[in-house]
Amino acid sequence: MKKLIALLLALTMALALVACGTTNDPATTPAPTTETPAPTSNEEPTGGDETAAVMTYAEYEAAAIDAAVTVECYVQATQSWWEDKITVYAQDADGAYFIYELKCSEEDAAKLTAGTKIRVSGFKGEWSGEVEIMDATFEFVEGADTFVAEPLDVTDLLGTEDLIKHQNKKVSFKELTIKKIEYKNGEPGDDIYVTVAKGEGEYSFCVERYLTDPVTDVYKAFADLKEGDVVNMEGFLYWYEGVNTHITAVTPAA
C-alpha cells in the first residue's frame, strides 16, 4: 500500500511540472500591430484654403451662368428677412447685383443697412432675363468704407438696348405717364403692377411689397395716383421679360 501511495504522489508531481512548463508568458506574447500605413502619393489631400478670389464687376459680368462667383459690394436695400434668408439689392462703383435669398441670420439681417460692405460667394444665375447671385453666403467686410449710390437717370435709355447694361442699379425716370395701376390679387396689400408710358413706349414696373410694404410712403402714394398722372420715379432696375423696375419712390413731375 505504501508503495502505491508513493507511486501516485510521484506521478502527480510529474504532471504538475509538465503543466508549468507549457504555460504562455504574457510578457513575451507579441502585441498586434496598430500602425496605419502612410498614404500613397496618389491619394488626394483634404482641407486646404478654400477662400475664393474677389472678382471685379467686369469679371463677374463676364462669368458664365452657373459659375461660382465672389464679389464685394455695398448694400443699397433689402427685402424682408424670412426663414434665414434675405434678398439684397447691392452696388459698387462699377455695377450692381441682385442677391437672391442670401443665407442670413435674423441678427445679421438687421445689420444689412444701406452702405454696408459685404463679401458674397454664390453662383451666377439668370431667370427671365434677370441676372442674379443665388445660393449665396456672405460676411461683413470689417473696417470698410460705406457707399450709397445716387440714382442714375436712365429715362433716355427706355426702349433701347443700352438700358439692360444698368441692370439692378439704383435708377431714376423723369416724366412718366401712368397708364394703369393694378393690385396683385385685386386689392391693396400685395404687389402693385404699374404700367407707365414714355414717348411711344409702355413699360411694366412694380411696387414689390417685400421691398416697400404697404406701410411705406411709396406704397401709399399709389392709392392717390390715376391714369394720366405724370410722375418721376426711382427704383432698382430689375428685369423680368424686359424692364420691370422695383419702385422705391414716386413724386409728381414738376
Functional labels for PLM-detected ranges:
Residues A6-L7, P39, G47-G48:
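Short amphipathic alpha-helical "recognition" segments used for binding
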Residues A16-P30, T34-T36:
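Bacterial lipoprotein signal-peptidase II cleavage site
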